[in-house]
């Protein structure tokens, strides 16, 4: 994979020039960007950012932008639980794609504050993974996978207001949606062309 240099932003302050990497500068505006697969390292960074922004201002919304193919279920659940735990409401915005755990996090934003741009793609499916080891270990892992699957479906049903039976059926295979279809499904609340459309939503 080619090396992509980190963009920096230079600002003038009363103490002179100050430079920020682009993600730190966005964080100043309460913007968090998830633009990679979800794993423990990514989850730890996003959780730390959520907790930091809560400490900075517990009453001001946080904006989580998502362009992710998904990833680890446990890592994603750690981010999701933190989104629900912090006092600020977390608005989610899909750019590009929100697939698998990315779609789960998109749906987990604050009610009325979940968005996607018109050409975004959203995909939900059941968790996947291979089991290895002795027969008893495989049985234990399979039971845990079924428990996690049921938990994810339950949470998704609550956020989308879809019957649990439909969530179970639709996630049996990859289920792709356009931004408009995701709105009808209840994964997001609105589709917008311009940022000002999201800014007009009630705080």
Curated annotation (Swiss-Prot):
It is found in: Cytoplasm. PROSITE patterns: CLP_PROTEASE_SER. Keywords: Cytoplasm, Hydrolase, Protease, Serine protease. It holds the Pfam family CLP_protease. One of its GO terms (cellular component) is endopeptidase Clp complex. Its EC number is 3.4.21.92. GO terms for molecular function: ATP-dependent peptidase activity; ATPase binding; serine-type endopeptidase activity. The keyword Hydrolase applies. GO terms for biological process: protein quality control for misfolded or incompletely synthesized proteins. The keyword Hydrolase applies. It catalyses: Hydrolysis of proteins to small peptides in the presence of ATP and magnesium. alpha-casein is the usual test substrate. In the absence of ATP, only oligopeptides shorter than five residues are hydrolyzed (such as succinyl-Leu-Tyr-|-NHMec, and Leu-Tyr-Leu-|-Tyr-Trp, in which cleavage of the -Tyr-|-Leu- and -Tyr-|-Trp bonds also occurs). Its main location: cytoplasm. The active site is at 100 (nucleophile), 125. Fourteen ClpP subunits assemble into 2 heptameric rings which stack back to back to give a disk-like structure with a central cavity, resembling the structure of eukaryotic proteasomes. NCBIfam families: clpP, PRK00277.1, PRK12553.1. Cleaves peptides in various proteins in a process that requires ATP hydrolysis. Has a chymotrypsin-like activity. Plays a major role in the degradation of misfolded proteins. Belongs to the peptidase S14 family. This is ATP-dependent Clp protease proteolytic subunit. It comes from Anaeromyxobacter dehalogenans (strain 2CP-C). The gene is clpP.
């Amino acid at each position: 994979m080619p090396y992509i240099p980190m963009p920096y932003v230079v600002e003038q302050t009363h103490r002179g020039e100050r430079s920020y990497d682009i993600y730190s500068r966005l964080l100043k505006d309460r913007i968090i960007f998830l633009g990679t697969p979800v794993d423990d390292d990514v989850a730890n960074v996003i959780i730390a950012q959520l907790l930091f922004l809560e400490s900075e201002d517990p009453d001001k919304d946080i904006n989580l932008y998502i362009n992710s193919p998904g990833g680890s279920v446990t890592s994603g659940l750690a981010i999701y639980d933190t989104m629900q735990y912090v006092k600020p409401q977390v608005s989610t915005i899909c750019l590009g794609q929100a697939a698998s755990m990315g779609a789960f996090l998109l749906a987990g934003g604050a009610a009325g504050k979940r968005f996607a741009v018109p050409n975004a793609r959203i995909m939900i499916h059941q968790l996947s993974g291979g089991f290895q080891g002795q027969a008893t270990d495989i049985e234990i892992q399979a039971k845990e996978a079924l428990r996690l699957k049921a938990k994810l479906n339950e949470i998704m049903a609550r956020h989308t207001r879809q019957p649990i039976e439909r969530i179970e059926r639709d996630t049996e295979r990859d289920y792709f949606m356009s931004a408009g279809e995701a709105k009808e499904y209840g994964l997001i609340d609105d589709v917008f062309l311009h940022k000002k459309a999201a800014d007009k939503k009630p705080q």
